[in-house]
Amino acid sequence: MHARLGLNVHRDAWPTTAVLAAYEAAGFAWVQVHTPPRAMLSERRQGLRHARALRTALDGTGLRLLVHAPDDLSAGTIEHDRAFDGLLDYAAAAGAELIAYHGLNFAEADGPAAARLRERAQLEERSLIPLLQRAHSLGITVAIENLAPLYPGQARRCHDPLAVRDLVRRLDSPAAGMLLDLGHLHITADATRSDPAAVLGACAPDVALFHAHDNLGCRRSIDAPGVDPIKLDLHLPPGRGTLPWARVAGIVGAHRTPVMLEVERSYRPALDVLAAESARLLLLAGSAAAAA
């Protein structure tokens, strides 16, 4: 078993006993499951029912749990803060150790709209402080993720990994860390012509979780057979795209945090092959590079 390696359950799927057993047999130690929508987290009753069923499914395995918050959850309003509080209840009931959260998920803007963006981001940050205090009391870490555009389009504040890292540092909470998504980093670094290894190195001390998947960067007219011709965030298996794994493996391999694979089902090889190849690219090669 690869103690740091995990695999996502697709947001539309339920982690059945057979699915979880297959993950464990392939060598994964972690599983990521998406929570119900915001409204159900706010309402509590249905959310907790879902969480308890998830815990029951996991109890027959040795898999450790990470839950992914709803993509549209952004602390900073009464409605969203209530849902975030329900998210913490959900994670505790399900026995999750980590929550993946999309912080700073606001469109970039100029002029008067820029002031509104700053205000909304400040409201989120203010709300996260007591929510993180509660997360800490529950033994849960909230990992805030750098994102990337699914298709070419408007930039969002969360597309800047350093902005996400700086939010984590300002929060200064033992229950807050960065979720460094390597696939997203590849897209945004390619778009800005930045060095992904340098950005990764600047963020590494604050990372509590990695997401790993591959893509073709911001594409720049690059195409490949068998994949969507215009999508950026392809979620290919590691090694199937153009992400420079050899340049990031040293930092990832030397880290102690989990590495969660998020691979689109239509591109996914056999689970044992996916686990072995991902471990070779990231964990084993990275550990060797760190020791050299």
Locations of the language-model features?
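Active-site beta-loop-alpha junctions enriched in small/polar residues
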Residues: 8-12, 34-38, 70-74, 104-106, ...
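Hydrophobic residues within beta-strands of alpha/beta enzymes
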Residues: 31-33, 99, 142, 210, ...
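Histidine-acidic metal/acid-base catalytic patches
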Residues: 1-4, 13, 17-27, 95, ...
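Aromatic/hydrophobic pocket-lining residues that form the small-molecule binding cavity
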Residues: 16, 47, 51, 80-87, ...
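Active-site acidic/histidine proton-transfer and metal-coordination neighborhood
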Residues: 60, 76-177
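Catalytic-core regions built around general acid/base machinery
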Residues: 47-61, 127-135, 167, 198-202, ...
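N-terminal pre-domain/capping segments
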Residues: 1-97, 177, 283-292
